[in-house]
Amino acid sequence: MQLLARANLIFGLHVHVGIPDRETAIHVMNQARYFLPHIYALSVNSPFWVGHDTGLKGYRLKVFERFPRTGIPDSFESLSEYTDYCNLLVKTGCIDNAKKIWWDIRLHPFFDTLEVRVCDAQSRVDDTLAIAALIQALISKLHKLLRQNVTFRIYRRRLLDENRWRASRYGIDGKLIDFGREKETETRNLIHEFIEFVADEVAELGSRREMNHIERILHEGTGADRQLAVWERTQDIKAVVDHIVAETYQGLSEVELAAKATVAS
């Protein structure tokens, strides 16, 4: 990858959710694609690049898009179609294995998981847990509905990309397209609908405490919003970095902090 790889100084949050049957996992992946911009909007945490305000809440994916085989994947009719796609790439020397497929969501080639890769890394532990809980509840919900032969319309990647761009640009402060209603809707409202959609799974999974934190994100803003607030106040990128460091320590126990101090010394 040459300079592309050397310049790829970005950090993402990848969440794995187990689905033992890979045929089922492909169909769950098809359904989950629609929700990726909603999840990304909650997770945006990369408004700066090389010390400059990019004007985007999430710039990380724009950096990563320089790589091949990124973004929201196309839908696949079956595991066989997906396997044929991967085998063709290996046969023609594009990749040596399917781990070189870096989509926003993918069927992991070695683990029996769906891996959601769209999110920016979070600076607060509670934000990380909340987003992971939302993803877990979504995959569980879609898996359960699929077993009941309930599915949703599969939208084209190019339509989903419109929402992905909006999430990158505005985070939770913008609007996403509600394709079912064919109109723009406040992102926060769609996320509230999302939370209601998975509410029964949250209760079953016992992740209510983690999920409740999403309301805090919606109220206080994303990691990107907090970084930009520091920037607006100080016009000092070092102050932004100090803020990120301070947030990273929030939620860590005294034992964990002591262990970090020991390693550092």
How would you name each of these model-derived features?
Residues 3, 64-265:
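C-terminal accessory/tail domains of diverse enzymes
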Residues 1-13, 17-20, 26-73, 77:
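Metal-dependent DNA replication initiation modules
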